């Protein structure tokens, strides 16, 4: 590590119950959110002259799950370069050696709001279809690199007032498993696909279910499947969409199948009743056409059996969405993930700590005078 990193580059400020020790270029820190992974502040970058988001990863080495997630997020943010995925602008640590290393700060673009705040606004079809199009483009880009999200929700999708949208994180690592019978834990399960809830195998269109739930919420202004735990989540889905076929039941593990088959049978509610005309914008004949297209898209995304659910590509070509189709956005070249073992890696905490430290040092090496190169996704040799 070069001697250029000295205390004079940093200052400390108290944010809620956490101390942020950040580079002096980042001023006017204001807390804007917190999650399982850490606290996020808005700040002004005096070098670039722009507002940014500074995220402090909370105790990234407290256990292997946190450490793996921190490493994965850092690697993916460095590799992914797409207009519908949040951009990483800087990475730093105030500590001067691996032995002292404790904190990781990620600096990203600052957006105006997350989708939770948009849900209570009345959106016209144009804005709604454009938001969904951008979501699908971002998801497709992640899929092209072998990243299946599995945990899309309004709180990790951010927007600007000009209706541009970006996905904030990379979801569950491939090795993260969800067991249907496990005790309830603190996680937003309302948007998770049946195959994730039921501990089945999954493929790319697992993320389409989440988009369907988010779209349904944008239309209705409230969560559409609001379960109190995993089991109740399943109940809420089948009460509205109906009990799935025997063919679907065969794909379940015996213990899960036994539970699912013993639930009361539900015929399901028609989509015209779940999403009636009056909850959509309807000022013109064109709106009426768009309403019927929007409902059709919902009916193809909110399908319990993933083998019968629409794919990301099919959703991008759906009449409700395809008006926005631009190959440069929908067919962008896949990101090159330089760590081929990213999803499968398992390490002791000290090894994770060293891997993350190397990533932070690599970023600092590639940054000149605190300003990152135009392409943070430039390839590294490992």
UniProtKB/Swiss-Prot annotation:
Classification via SUPFAM superfamilies: Protein kinase-like (PK-like)
Tissues where the protein occurs: Expressed in the neuroepithelium of developing brain at stages 16 to 26.
Cofactor(s) needed: Mg(2+)
Residue span of motif TXY: 183-185
Binding sites annotated in the UniProt record for ATP: 33-38, 55
GO biological process terms, semicolon-separated: embryo development ending in birth or egg hatching; JNK cascade; rhythmic process
Phosphotyrosine found at: 185
Keyword Nucleotide-binding part of the UniProt annotation: yes
Xref: InterPro entries: Kinase-like_dom_sf, MAP_kinase, MAP_kinase_CS, MAPK_JNK, Prot_kinase_dom, Ser/Thr_kinase_AS
Record PTM text: Dually phosphorylated on Thr-183 and Tyr-185, which activates the enzyme.
E.C. designation(s): 2.7.11.24
Activity modulation: Activated by threonine and tyrosine phosphorylation.
Function of the protein: Responds to activation by environmental stress and pro-inflammatory cytokines by phosphorylating a number of transcription factors, primarily components of AP-1 such as JUN and ATF2 and thus regulates AP-1 transcriptional activity. May play a role in the development of the central nervous system during embryogenesis. May play a role in the regulation of the circadian clock.
Name by which UniProt lists this protein: Mitogen-activated protein kinase 9
